[in-house]
């Protein structure tokens, strides 16, 4: 399938640690409930899964934030739990309760029965990727994504979100053999899922390790990081247009393990708002070796509830924490992709998002001229 030429490659250039004329910005959950137009589309769809499984609706909501804001990337509208749903766990979204699985993975028999799902069951996701890429018409790149093997395991074993991760950690400590088997299936499933998104037109892919930070030191490396590495090792390197596809890994609460994460075979590390960007740049962003990473993040999403003038001041703090942008067009160097430290709140005022995006672009251009 021929694709329109890319008009704004700032995000991709930053992923590859190449100099850009401004710091690119996109936001986790940028297509979502804080936008009244999203709420209206979801009402027409009837449910969250009605939205996510309908190609036209998924395309519409993915593009909605780009109609409002000059963002530098689009991200597929979907959910991380589509993969375990395709495994037959029976996903539903109850009003006010969030996601729930009818058949959680608890016990030896349930783990033994798990296998990599038939990707045909996820055709609606890949159709949406192709549709969105076409609708973008080269405006900005499209990011595909998946949950990490560990984060998916948390939902699969608990059966829903959890405050204490008692069931999944009980399996991890009492039956590590079962946990390793579950994570291996998840890793191979996620790799196949992301490869299919790449084949459909995704220009970058991101692994969300939303719950990696709940693990103890040592357990994180064994049960989260190792299986994220297995996913990355299974990813194809070029997209449907023949262009290389950068890989992003975001671990919420993962600041303690940045040095270990520098060893991952990916291009970008996302960090949350607890991480000092200057220190992160020194740890993983500097250097001329192939393992040096671009950084993505990391403003606190709750900054968006402050008045616009304060949002601008907080943007300045993040940009200054990262430091002087890489400017040598002939060489790679430390680069920064501006994002939130986690997903945007549904209660965020849309005009405050406009203030943030405008501030990132204006201030980061000024930094380069300074």
UniProtKB/Swiss-Prot annotation:
Its GO biological process annotations read: protoporphyrinogen IX biosynthetic process from glutamate
Q: In which pathway does it act?
A: Porphyrin-containing compound metabolism; protoporphyrin-IX biosynthesis; coproporphyrinogen-III from 5-aminolevulinate: step 4/4
Q: List localization entries.
A: Cytoplasm
Q: Family per UniProt?
A: Belongs to the uroporphyrinogen decarboxylase family.
Q: Under the cellular component aspect of Gene Ontology, which terms does the record hold? A: cytosol
Protein name in UniProt = Uroporphyrinogen decarboxylase
Q: Which cysteines are joined by disulfide bonds?
A: none
Which Pfam families does this entry report, sorted A to Z? URO-D (PF01208)
Where, in this chain's numbering, is substrate bound? 29-33, 79, 155, 210, 342
- HAMAP family from the entry? URO_D (MF_00218)
> What quaternary structure, including any partners, is listed in this protein's UniProt entry?
Homodimer.
**What is the catalytic activity of this protein?**
uroporphyrinogen III + 4 H(+) = coproporphyrinogen III + 4 CO2
Q: Which GO molecular function terms does the record list? A: uroporphyrinogen decarboxylase activity
**Where exactly is the site Transition state stabilizer?**
79
Q: Which domain of life is it from?
A: Bacteria
Main function: Catalyzes the decarboxylation of four acetate groups of uroporphyrinogen-III to yield coproporphyrinogen-III.
Keywords annotated in UniProt: Cytoplasm, Decarboxylase, Lyase, Porphyrin biosynthesis
What does the record give as EC number? 4.1.1.37
């Amino acid at each position: 399938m021929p694709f329109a030429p890319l008009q704004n490659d700032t995000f991709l250039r930053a992923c590859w640690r190449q100099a850009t004329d401004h710091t690119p910005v996109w936001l986790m959950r940028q297509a979502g409930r804080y936008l009244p137009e999203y709420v209206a589309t979801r009402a027409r769809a009837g449910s969250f899964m009605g939205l996510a499984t309908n190609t036209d609706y998924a395309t519409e909501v993915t593009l909605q934030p780009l109609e409002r804001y000059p963002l530098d990337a689009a991200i597929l509208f979907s959910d991380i739990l589509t993969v375990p749903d395709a495994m037959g766990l029976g996903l539903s979204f109850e009003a006010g309760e969030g996601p729930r699985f009818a058949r959680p993975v608890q016990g030896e028999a349930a783990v033994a029965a798990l296998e990599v799902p038939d990707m045909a069951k996820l055709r609606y996701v890949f159709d949406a990727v192709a549709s969105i890429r076409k609708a973008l018409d080269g405006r900005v790149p499209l990011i595909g994504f998946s949950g990490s093997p560990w984060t998916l395991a948390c939902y699969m074993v608990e059966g829903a979100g959890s405050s204490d991760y008692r069931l999944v950690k009980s399996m991890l400590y009492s039956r590590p053999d079962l946990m390793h088997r579950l994570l291996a299936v998840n890793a191979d499933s996620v790799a196949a899922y992301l490869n299919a998104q790449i084949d459909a037109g995704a220009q970058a892919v991101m692994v969300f390790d939303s719950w990696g930070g709940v693990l103890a030191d040592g357990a994180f490396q064994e049960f989260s990081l190792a299986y994220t590495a297995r996913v990355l090792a299974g990813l194809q390197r070029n997209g449907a247009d023949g262009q290389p596809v950068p890989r992003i890994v975001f671990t919420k609460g993962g600041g303690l393990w940045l040095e270990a994460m520098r060893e991952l075979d990916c291009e970008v590390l996302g960090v949350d708002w607890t991480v000092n960007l200057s220190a992160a740049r020194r740890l993983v962003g500097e250097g001329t070796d192939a393992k040096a990473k671009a950084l993505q993040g990391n403003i606190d999403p709750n900054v968006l509830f402050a008045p616009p003038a304060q949002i601008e001041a907080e943007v300045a703090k993040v940009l200054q924490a990262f430091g002087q942008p890489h400017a040598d067009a002939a060489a790679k160097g430390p680069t920064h992709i501006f994002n939130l430290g986690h997903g945007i709140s549904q209660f965020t005022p849309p005009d405050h998002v406009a203030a943030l995006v405008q501030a990132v672009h204006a201030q980061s251009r000024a930094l380069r001229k300074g």
